[in-house]
Amino acid sequence: MAVARAFAVDPDLLLMDEPYGQLDVKLRYYLEDELVRLWKALKSTVIFITHNVEEAVYVAERILILSNKPTTIKAEVKVDLPRPRSVIDPNFVAIRKQVTDLIRWW
């Protein structure tokens, strides 16, 4: 509901910090699709903070990997995949692995 309220005011920028952390998997998948649909319709910039790599690859156009030093960006990964995305697509899996490897090796 909070996501719907946030988009209702048609923001230029929306910051979402772990918005799906306490949701079950089925609801999370549904809301990820809704977020992408709203983002495309409203053309707002969304900064989506998550520790879930699969979630990041699913919703993002680009992923910023932060280093262990505060406010330092270690890497940027472009996610140039068509929508709707499939978590079993080989390109999706490759990007997920790339992000995971960047996180693993600070």
Please state what every model-predicted region is.
Residues 14-17:
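Catalytic Walker B motif of ABC-type/P-loop ATPase nucleotide-binding domains
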Residues 10:
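Conserved catalytic motifs of ABC-family nucleotide-binding domains
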Residues 58-65:
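Conserved catalytic segment of ABC-fold P-loop ATPases
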Residues 22-23, 27:
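Short coil-to-helix N-cap segments within the nucleotide-binding domains
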Residues 44-49:
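Conserved H-loop
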Residues 28-42:
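Helical segment within the ABC ATPase nucleotide-binding domain
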Residues 69-96:
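Conserved beta-strand-loop-alpha-helix hinge in the C-terminal portion
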